[in-house]
């Protein structure tokens, strides 16, 4: 049985409210869960301490038993200091795209041609 620490959605339409639960990975998103370990209310301001509340002892116990947090829950756990989120590296993100390279080359060529005419 593969356990996940994940979010289950509650609340009304356009007013989401999430419980952070430990559940079998095969169970539905809002289906049966083993234990509730926290809540997340995205409608509260970001600086509100009650926006995310976690029961750290329970979470640490489940992590020790092998439960895997989902990406969003791992962000919450990292912010609370309960788990470490691995750093991601995307070296191509900072590299300019194909069209940007072409525009830069055209600009450099145009600037080079302008310097020759002035000299």
Curated annotation (Swiss-Prot):
SUPFAM superfamilies assigned to the protein according to its UniProt record, in alphabetical order: Ribosomal protein S16
Stored PANTHER family: 30S RIBOSOMAL PROTEIN S16 (PTHR12919), SMALL RIBOSOMAL SUBUNIT PROTEIN BS16M (PTHR12919:SF20)
GO biological process assignments: translation
Protein name as catalogued: Small ribosomal subunit protein bS16
The family this protein is said to belong to: Belongs to the bacterial ribosomal protein bS16 family.
Transmembrane annotation, as ranges: none
Bias (Basic and acidic residues): 92-113
Region (Disordered) location: 81-119
UniProt GO cellular component terms: cytoplasm; small ribosomal subunit
GO molecular function: structural constituent of ribosome
InterPro entries linked to this entry: Ribosomal_bS16, Ribosomal_bS16_CS, Ribosomal_bS16_dom_sf
Source organism of the structure: Methylobacterium sp. (strain 4-46)
Highest taxon above the source species: Bacteria
Keyword vocabulary terms for this entry: Ribonucleoprotein, Ribosomal protein
